[in-house]
Design a protein with these regions (language model features):
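Conserved PLP-binding catalytic core of the aspartate aminotransferase-like
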Residues: 143, 151-184
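Active-site pre-lysine segment of PLP-dependent enzymes
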Residues: 4-15, 27-86
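Structural motif
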Residues: 18-22, 52, 96-98
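PLP-dependent aminotransferase class I/II
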Residues: 76-154, 158-161
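PLP-dependent enzyme catalytic core of the Aspartate aminotransferase-like
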Residues: 182-183, 192-224
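Short beta-strand-to-loop capping motifs
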Residues: 99, 170-172, 205-207
Length: 224
């Protein structure tokens, strides 16, 4: 599931107008190799290809490094960020982008609806910026709990994809999501992702007691 050099070769060969990447990947949670990502950025800059990079989950990884320093030398780089992911504010829908392409920003501004960021979302965003210690605490929990959750899933016989993020991709019995829903637990079925089929799911890495509740429900659902 890791992005490889064949992708770099494909970009060089096909020369698309734009490249869209997600770092870390969703739904695998794997970070793109920094060297490879730098080469992709260099190639896109050389060929005049826009590079759109989703970094919405990057702040919740321990090893992830933003491409923000490359904005200075790559006008075609476009970074996507979100308070909703880093601070758990999904219902408020607050995100932003970073780019040197002012012409593109003006075009985007002309197409967006007026008042596209609500007052509650603005207030929550300002408050979140003051919570500098929160992200580190969140990362500490994720780094501690992710290997435990992955090991528990493997112990149930599920295939688990290595992850650097706050979620795990695993394969198990089909219909597992519906079984868990009946006991009040939601996991993300991933059959609609390219290359995945029924039986692939994504789960969040949460607090210890919540992860234990998930594993207990999975154990019962799988008859283990």
């Amino acid at each position: 599931f890791a992005l490889g050099r064949d992708f770099l070769d494909a970009v060089a060969r096909e020369a698309p107008d734009a490249v869209f990447l997600c770092n870390p990947n969703n739904p695998t949670g794997r970070l793109i190799d920094p060297g490879l990502l730098g080469e992709i950025a260099d190639l896109c800059r050389e060929k005049g290809i826009r590079l759109f990079l989703d970094e919405c989950f990057l702040d919740l990884t321990e090893q992830g490094r933003s491409m923000k320093p490359r904005l200075a030398d790559f006008p075609g780089l476009f970074l996507l960020k979100a308070f909703t992911k880093s601070y758990g504010m999904a219902g408020l829908r607050l995100g932003y982008c970073l780019t040197r392409d002012h012409a593109l920003l003006r075009r985007m501004g002309a197409e967006t609806q007026p008042w596209n960021v609500s007052v509650p979302a603005q207030a929550a965003g300002v408050a979140a910026l003051g919570e500098r210690a929160f992200l580190q605490r969140a990362k500490d929990v994720i780094e501690s709990e992710r290997p435990k959750l992955a090991a528990a899933l493997r112990a149930l016989g599920f295939r688990v994809v290595p992850s650097d993020a706050n979620y795990l991709l695993f394969s198990g019995p089909t219909g597992l999501d519906m079984t868990l829903r009946r006991v009040g637990i939601a996991i993300r079925p991933c059959a609609n992702y390219h290359g995945l089929t029924d039986g692939w799911y994504r789960v969040a890495v949460r607090l210890p007691e919540e992860n234990e509740q998930l594993i207990a429900a999975l154990r019962e659902a799988a008859g283990r």
